């Protein structure tokens, strides 16, 4: 075991400890951090390396851009100019295996780079790092009992990795931070996330199939993902699936509490192609199971072929083989199932779903500043351009709802849409389903 203090690390939160910590890491094996605040720029992990942080040990991101990697340090890395993220990372694991980070705290020092109350993202004139933890084309990764806080962008990004365990991790990002995701799992295989608490300003957990053209060894498939026993508080989606042009398949999500976001469960094949043209083809999403969830979000469920108010003529990728069961949800805007005109949103089962709908004062408001009109329809659930969809033993109730609501279910151009043993109450102003 190598103690970073034996290599000259001070741990006072003022002295830059990057060189000393990197020297300890370069020795390999277990690197021990006693209590203290270790101010660091980019740290590069090697295979068979463990970072063991004692209680009270903090790796704190340097406020100086020159202490971080260059954006072209590896061909897989990227800069996202629309999101003002410049490709720098605090901890990097590139093409390595058997890496462990355990205990302590990793702090991205977001406040050193920007104050979201002073700028919008589009108006921000400065520089900020990208993902705080960056794992790329690596395998056998364990993240355990570690806090990750104050990331200036996404917190933890796993791209093209395999055999990953994320257990008892606590992620906290300040509300209002642009793109402050929790976990982004992209083109990865065999991932288990369990017993985590994530409080994120953007998506808490995002399953993606993006950037496959940048990967050197992995493909664009994200599969065999299991997420269980987590509490997620989100500014956007509790769980998001989609983004990119690869495939997402064979995923389970169970025993989750999702709170406070715009979306509880969000699946979206094509996402903002005008901003991200590489993903215009869309991600295929199949064989997905959600079970035993408590969801409290503005829009509890959104499964859509594209990010648009209206269906497109064709889809290049399918969303199919989706099951949601044993879910209790609370919302104030319209949940959506919307495919494109080729009915490539198909084979969906909703079983034992209970939704309670409140509010609705902005329903049918085309001037709402931030929510597309498709989420402001006068029904609790809107279903359009789908095929082979079953609702079984589902219930919709109302509480303190606006008179703008008209009905529980709205449908348009569906094939084989079946409801069995369902109870859909009318809102106060409703005139039929």
Predicted segments — roles?
Residues 1-433:
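Extracellular/periplasmic carbohydrate-active domains that bind, remodel
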């Amino acid at each position: 075991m190598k103690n970073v203090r034996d290599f000259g690390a001070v741990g006072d939160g003022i002295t830059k400890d990057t060189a000393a910590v990197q020297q300890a890491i370069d020795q390999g094996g277990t690197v021990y951090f006693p209590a203290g605040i270790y101010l660091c720029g980019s740290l590069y992990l090697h295979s068979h390396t463990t970072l063991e942080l004692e209680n009270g040990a903090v790796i704190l991101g340097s406020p100086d851009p020159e202490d971080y990697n260059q954006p072209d340090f590896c061909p897989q890395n990227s800069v996202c100019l629309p999101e003002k993220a410049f490709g720098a990372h605090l901890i990097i694991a590139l093409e390595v295996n058997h890496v462990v980070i355990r205990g302590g705290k990793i702090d991205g020092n977001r406040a050193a780079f920007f104050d979201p109350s002073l700028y919008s993202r589009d108006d921000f004139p400065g520089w900020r790092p990208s993902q705080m933890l960056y794992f790329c084309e690596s395998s056998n990764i364990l993240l355990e009992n570690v806090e990750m806080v104050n990331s200036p962008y996404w917190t933890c990004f796993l791209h093209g990795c395999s055999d990953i365990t994320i257990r008892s991790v606590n992620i906290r990002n300040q509300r209002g931070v642009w793109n402050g995701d929790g976990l982004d799992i992209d083109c990865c295989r065999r991932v288990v996330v369990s017993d985590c608490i994530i409080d994120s300003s953007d998506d808490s957990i995002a399953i993606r199939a993006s950037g496959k053209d940048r990967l050197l060894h992995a493909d664009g498939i994200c599969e065999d993902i299991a997420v269980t026993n987590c509490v997620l508080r989100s500014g956007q989606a509790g769980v998001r699936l989609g983004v990119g042009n690869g495939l997402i398949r064979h995923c389970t999500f169970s025993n989750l509490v999702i709170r406070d976001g715009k979306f509880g469960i969000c699946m979206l094949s094509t996402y903002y192609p005008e901003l991200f043209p590489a993903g215009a083809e869309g991600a295929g999403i199949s064989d997905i199971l959600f079970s035993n969830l408590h969801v409290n979000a503005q829009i509890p469920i959104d499964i859509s072929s594209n990010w648009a108010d209206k269906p497109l003529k064709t889809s290049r990728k399918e969303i199919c083989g989706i099951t949601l069961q044993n879910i209790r949800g609370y919302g104030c805007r319209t949940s959506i199932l919307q495919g494109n005109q080729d009915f490539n949103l198909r084979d969906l089962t909703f079983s034992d779903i209970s939704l309670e709908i409140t509010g609705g004062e902005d329903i049918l408001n085309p001037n709402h500043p931030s929510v597309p009109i498709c989420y402001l329809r006068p029904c609790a659930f809107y279903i359009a351009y789908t095929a082979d969809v079953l609702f079984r033993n589902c219930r919709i109730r109302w509480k303190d709802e606006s008179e703008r609501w008209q009905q529980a279910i709205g449908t348009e151009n569906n094939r084989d849409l079946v409801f069995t043993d369902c109870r859909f109450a009318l809102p106060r102003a409703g005139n039929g389903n």
